[in-house]
Amino acid sequence: MKIVFLTAGAAGMFCGSCMHDNALAKALRREGADCLLQPLYTPIRTDESSVADTHVFFGGVNIYLLDKVPLFRFVPAFLKRLLDRPGFLAWATRRAGSTDAKLLGDLTLSMLSGEAGNQAEEVTRLVAWLRDEIRPDAILFTNLLIAGVIPAIRRELPQAKLVAILQGDDAFLDHLPSPYRERAEGRIGELGRQCDAIVVNSIRYGESMASRLGLDAARLKLLPLTIDTAPFRDFVPKSQRDVRPEAVRIGYFARIAPEKGLHNLIDAFIDLCGRPGCEDVRLDFAGWLGEQNRGYLEEQLSKLERAGLGDRAAYLGSPDLRGKLAMLGELDLFSVPTSHEEPKGLSVLEALAAGVPVVLPAKGAFPELVESTGGGLLVDPDDPHALADGLYRLVRDPESRRRLGRIGREHVMTRRGVESQARQMIEMLGMQPISR
């Protein structure tokens, strides 16, 4: 079976969806599928080896100029291809991850319009490549925001199965101003109804998005979230190492952005540090920081300083895989108390794989993650005091921390490897996987 997996580059930032797409593409290959991971917009950036193709369709510079400069469509094709070179795209879009979604309303609608949009020539180029050179049996879309090409693909490759993954489309849509948001939601719903299947990692999140986009919830296909467990096979959790007792260390690993809820954790940490027995509790947080959120980070650091806790918390930047493993190896607890409905929770599975128990809000994909893995506690969402209560319970109970960490790690390492998701995907597409 030949599969083309269309993934969306994130302008040089470490992107959870990109990294998971890369891991899934590798696993699909190991299971016997001829899978091509094809980037759109920009090259993808991962924290391990990438299998993505080197050329890019819908290059970020090209689609922007096609949308904003009508005469650009008359520029010779060979010059446009120069703008799609990976090195140039990486340089030209190095700050694009800081672009506010509310400034992209027209471009979003144009991209979703496919052949009727300003990027029609890019639609034609991609579809011709799929039809004439690749001839795939199935095409996977990393989200429905990139699915404006579906009607053209349906016409030119009627036998190909089209599968989209719902994994964070809402986070982008929520930042679009009205009426762009409503129009985009309507169009995404139309495109979703033309897919053979919609994959979700969480039933709760999937049903919420189906209602929002007007999709039939019965057509959702649940493929539980997985990670590449290879980096964690020889990992020794802190709770199992012979280390002297020290301060309990709480960790956060996600984008530094309001929707990921760092402010909730900072407020909970300040609350927690005023409680008996928490005089030495520390907080380490890390994740990609866009220019538009530097003020947000400064606000959180200022809160810590005003509370007299500046020396007990640290921002560790955006580490690579080795740095992430080193950070997880020093943690006793983990929390990403998102403000939005989290569709995945990759960093949660990574923390559990490292034997670190989690304390999470009961919203989005988190209830299913915690209940299925048994590796943590759920608390009321958007409530820093409730989060502090959950953290305090485990700060004061090291035996429960060890037990939850052990249970969570065992579940992830035995049942949440990306190979299982690849097998389910292949079976859904009608092919027999190599392993069972």
What is each of the regions a protein language model found here?
Residues 282-299:
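Glycosyltransferase donor-sugar binding loop
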Residues 37-125:
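A conserved catalytic-core segment of Leloir-type glycosyltransferases
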Residues 386, 393, 400-414, 421-424:
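A short, well-ordered alpha-helix in the C-terminal region of glycosyltransferases
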Residues 242-260, 266-269, 284:
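Conserved donor-binding/catalytic core segment of Leloir-type glycosyltransferases
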Residues 297-319:
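Nucleotide-activated donor-binding/catalytic signature segment of Leloir-type glycosyltransferases, i.e.
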Residues 357-360:
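Short hydrophobic beta-strand element within catalytic cores of glycosyltransferases
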Residues 372-373, 377-384, 393-398:
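Conserved acidic donor-binding segment of nucleotide-sugar-dependent glycosyltransferases
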Residues 204, 226:
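Carbohydrate-associated surface elements
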